[in-house]
Amino acid sequence: MAFSDLTSRTVRLYDNWIKDADPRVEDWLLMSSPLPQTIILGFYVYFVTSLGPKLMENRKPFELKKVMITYNFSIVLFSVYMFYEFIMSGWGTGYSFRCDIVDYSQSPTALRMVRTCWLYYFSKFIELLDTIFFILRKKNSQVTFLHVFHHTIMPWTWWFGVKFAAGGLGTFHAFLNTAVHVVMYSYYGLCALGPDYQKYLWWKKYLTSLQLIQFVLITIHISQFFFMEDCKYQFPVFQYIIMSYGCIFLLLFLHFWYRAYTKGQRLPKTVKHGICKNKDH
């Protein structure tokens, strides 16, 4: 009886909560409920931390050079497109970089922002292949807590962002992240091309710095919200989530930076047989 009451209360709570969702995305892929993505991400974590390494234990690593080249440069093109769409749907056409509220109208610009937010959300599932490729290539040491946590928490939290607040100041970190990914995946793509392209990778040592700058800018931008008394942003809870996200990843990347460059435990490695040896993000 107690379980039945708990279930009923949970259903009522969910129904009351979901009524505030954005109706524009109700019928979009993966947007009806958080359950499908939770199942996908749960299996992802299980595969990359347990099942995958076991399946590959007595197998030779896959040779994925051509696949990696195609994948990385495809992500570059996709990221360029999303960056452009974020600019054209708000960040370059009217957003103030301060108190930018969500536009829930059916205007072309508002719908363009919603579509761009969903594309960014969906791109996070495509990027799960980063870890899958590590497993298939038997690069298990690259499957760090930072890597798995980042690839899991981003799509899961972004479902709620798209479902309730697709636009406004809460999308700044996505806008910035697409630009960073253009640089990062360009490096990975060039790296995958092989040793002949090493001369074009002199800037690899700046990748971690670029990500640190990204999280500093995200934290600074979102911190403004807490000092603006008249900001009418519709879902303040997302600002606390983004603030936590920025601080957590800033600390994790600072730890990585210290371990890799100060203590010298994990310096970036060059390519071997045309495949990148280091891919933390």
From Swiss-Prot:
Q: Where do transmembrane segments lie in this chain?
A: 28-48, 67-87, 116-136, 143-162, 172-194, 207-227, 237-257
Which Pfam families does UniProt cross-reference here? ELO
GO molecular-function terms, A-Z: fatty acid elongase activity
Q: Which residues form a coiled coil?
A: none
Q: What pathway does this protein act in?
A: Lipid metabolism; fatty acid biosynthesis
**Subcellular location, in the record's words?**
Endoplasmic reticulum membrane
List all topological domains (Cytoplasmic).
49-66, 137-142, 195-206, 258-281
Positions annotated to bind 3-oxoeicosanoyl-CoA: K124, R137, K139, Q142, H147, Y187, K204, T208, Q211, R266
Q: Which cellular component terms (GO) are annotated to the entry?
A: endoplasmic reticulum; endoplasmic reticulum membrane
Q: What is its EC number?
A: 2.3.1.199
Superkingdom to which the source organism belongs: Eukaryota
Q: Is Endoplasmic reticulum a UniProt keyword of this protein?
A: yes
Q: Which reaction does it catalyse?
A: a very-long-chain acyl-CoA + malonyl-CoA + H(+) = a very-long-chain 3-oxoacyl-CoA + CO2 + CoA; eicosanoyl-CoA + malonyl-CoA + H(+) = 3-oxodocosanoyl-CoA + CO2 + CoA; (5Z,8Z,11Z,14Z)-eicosatetraenoyl-CoA + malonyl-CoA + H(+) = (7Z,10Z,13Z,16Z)-3-oxodocosatetraenoyl-CoA + CO2 + CoA; (6Z,9Z,12Z)-octadecatrienoyl-CoA + malonyl-CoA + H(+) = (8Z,11Z,14Z)-3-oxoeicosatrienoyl-CoA + CO2 + CoA
For the modification N-acetylalanine, which residues carry it?
A2
Motif Di-lysine motif is found at 277-281
Residues exposed to the Lumenal side: 2-27, 88-115, 163-171, 228-236
Q: Which cysteines are joined by disulfide bonds?
A: C99-C231
The protein's matches in PANTHER family, at most eight in alphabetical order, are given as: ELONGATION OF VERY LONG CHAIN FATTY ACIDS PROTEIN 7 (PTHR11157:SF118), FATTY ACID ACYL TRANSFERASE-RELATED (PTHR11157)
Domain comment from the record reads as follows: The C-terminal di-lysine motif may confer endoplasmic reticulum localization.
Q: Give a short account of what the protein does.
A: Catalyzes the first and rate-limiting reaction of the four reactions that constitute the long-chain fatty acids elongation cycle. This endoplasmic reticulum-bound enzymatic process allows the addition of 2 carbons to the chain of long- and very long-chain fatty acids (VLCFAs) per cycle. Condensing enzyme with higher activity toward C18 acyl-CoAs, especially C18:3(n-3) acyl-CoAs and C18:3(n-6)-CoAs. Also active toward C20:4-, C18:0-, C18:1-, C18:2- and C16:0-CoAs, and weakly toward C20:0-CoA. Little or no activity toward C22:0-, C24:0-, or C26:0-CoAs.
Please give the subunit comment from the record: Homodimer. Interacts with TECR.
Family listed: Belongs to the ELO family. ELOVL7 subfamily.
The entry's protein name is Very long chain fatty acid elongase 7
State the species of origin: Bos taurus (Bovine)
Gene from which the chain derives: ELOVL7
